[in-house]
Amino acid sequence: MVATGGQAQDQGQNQEPDVLNPTSAVTGLPQKRYYRQRAHSNPIADHSFDYPARPEDVDWRSMYPGIQQGQQVSFADIGCGYGGFLVTLGEMFPEKLSIGMEIRVKVSDYVVDRIAALRRRCADTGAYQNIACLRTNAMKYLPNYFVKGQLEKMFFLYPDPHFKRAKHKWRIINQALLSEYAYILRKGGLLYTMTDVEDLHKWIVTHMEEHPLYERLTEEEANADPITPKLYQSSEEGAKVVRNKGDHFLAIFRRL
């Protein structure tokens, strides 16, 4: 079996001084101030990742100790940040396995530690055994983790807008990647997008609507989805937008 996230290798290479990462005495959860990192990471850079050669090589049991024979990950939160929405998914869908994928090493470390703390705190109920996080570059390695038609839902919440025109190719929604997403998303599955940047929202909608394998949900359909209200402030980035009274731009698409 291969390691799934490459965290240990990257941490060894960074050679950063050891820093205590104390948990909160009140909540028992890790404190984000000990895991701070720049807001975004270059997805094109040659990061060092340990990734599986094929989905069959992923050691899911190391992330989901209670996983059942034949059970698969159903939901993927791409660029999960500090894991707020991932935790919400675990609470809303206890019977489903959800994975958060994050490229930034300290941020993914925080989510891993947060999930471990939640599991310890809820040891008597077994809650949060259905969520996990791994560090990887989703723009490069998603097909290495998921088989065709595996995912029911994919989430792209507040992705890096890459404002400069020369960097638009780095946006996680583009025609080439949409075909990869369509490959791992089952027919009828949903792809959720949320941003506070109107230009990026228009870019997403244009590219999604131009792709033959997606159709946008109507406003009525989107509002009827029980997940929709959670998209606005379950994630840390979404909560910040709410605090700053910013705009939210939502678009949900169905895999045809």
UniProtKB/Swiss-Prot annotation:
Any Gene Ontology biological process? RNA (guanine-N7)-methylation
Example GO molecular function: tRNA binding
Which keywords belong to this entry? Differentiation, Methyltransferase, Nucleus, RNA-binding, S-adenosyl-L-methionine, Spermatogenesis, Transferase, tRNA processing, tRNA-binding
List the protein's name: tRNA (guanine-N(7)-)-methyltransferase
Report the function annotation for this chain.
Catalytic component of Mettl1-wuho methyltransferase complex that mediates the formation of N(7)-methylguanine in a subset of RNA species, such as tRNAs, mRNAs and microRNAs (miRNAs). Catalyzes the formation of N(7)-methylguanine at position 46 (m7G46) in a subset of tRNAs that contain the 5'-RAGGU-3' motif within the variable loop. M7G46 interacts with C13-G22 in the D-loop to stabilize tRNA tertiary structure and protect tRNAs from decay. Required for the elongation step of spermatid formation.
Its taxonomic path starts at:
Eukaryota, Metazoa, Ecdysozoa, Arthropoda, Hexapoda
Family matches, as PANTHER family: 3-DEOXY-D-MANNO-OCTULOSONIC-ACID TRANSFERASE/TRNA GUANINE-N 7 - -METHYLTRANSFERASE (PTHR23417), TRNA (GUANINE-N(7)-)-METHYLTRANSFERASE (PTHR23417:SF16)
Q: Please give the tissue specificity annotation from the record for this chain.
A: Expressed in testis and ovary (at protein level). Ubiquitously expressed in all testicular cells throughout spermatogenesis.
Which species? Drosophila melanogaster (Fruit fly)
| EC number, UniProt record | 2.1.1.33
Instruction: Describe the subunit structure.
Output: Interacts with wuho.
Q: Where is the active site?
A: 160
Task: State the source organism's domain of life.
Answer: Eukaryota
Task: Write out the GO cellular component annotations.
Answer: nucleus; tRNA (m7G46) methyltransferase complex; tRNA methyltransferase complex
In this chain, S-adenosyl-L-methionine is annotated as bound at: 79, 102-103, 137-138, 157, 235-237
* Cell compartments where the protein resides: Nucleus
Named in its record, the pathway it takes part in is: tRNA modification; N(7)-methylguanine-tRNA biosynthesis
Q: Which stretches of sequence are listed as region Disordered?
A: 1-25
